[in-house]
Amino acid sequence: MAGKLKLVAALGAIILMGGAIALADRQTAPEAATASAISGFSRDATADLQGYYIPLWNAETSVSAKYRAGNFVLNNLAISTKTELAAFEKSGASGIKNYAPVMLEFDDVTSPTGENELGQTYYETTERILPDAYAITADTLTFKGTGPTLGTVTFTGKADPKGIKAARNAPAHISKGAVLTGTLTVGDTVIENVELMWYGGE
C-alpha cells in the first residue's frame, strides 16, 4: 500500500465534488473524547482490517457521502498489512515520507483539479493525517493524528469483519454498504455517523 500515493476509486465519482455534506456536531461526542485520550500503538493480533475505507457511495444516484471540515473532505482511511503495522509499531515510523500503515487522507475541495490516466478527476491539494496513536481490535479502530493544516484529527469506529471479508472475496473488491462506522473529529468539528465502505484498491 506504500506505493499507492493517491487513491482514486474505480467507481467513477466516489470522491468528487457532488454529494451530501455531512452535518457537523460541534459538541464533543464520547467516542471523540476516547480517541483524543489514547497514546501509543496497540493492535489485537487477530485483527485484519487491511484495506481502504471510503465514504459510502450510492450506486443508484452515483453520489457519495461528504464528510467535510472547512475546505477539506475525507477521501479515505487506509489500513495496511499486519507486517507493515508490526514494523511501524516497533519504531513509530514507516521509513517512507508522508506515509504510515494507518492514515487518513483529505482533499482540499477549493484546490485545482486534475485528471488521471483513467479520466477520473482528483483534487491537486491533499493532506494526509499520520498517526500519533491508534488502537486496533478485530472490530474497532481508534485513531489520533495531526495534520499541518487540519490539526488534531481523531476517528473512533466500529468495523464489520464479516462484511469486510465478503468484500475481499467479491469480484469488484468493494463492500455493498458501510463496514466501518463511527465519529470523526477535525479540530473543533465533530462529525458523527460517518459511514465508510471497504475498497480493495487498484
Map each language-model feature to its residues:
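Sec-dependent N-terminal signal peptides
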Residues: 1-25
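Small/flexible residues
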Residues: 6-8, 28, 45, 70
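Short, low-complexity, disordered segments immediately C-terminal to signal peptides
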Residues: 26-39
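Central antiparallel beta-sheet cores of small beta-barrel/beta-sandwich binding domains
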Residues: 43-202
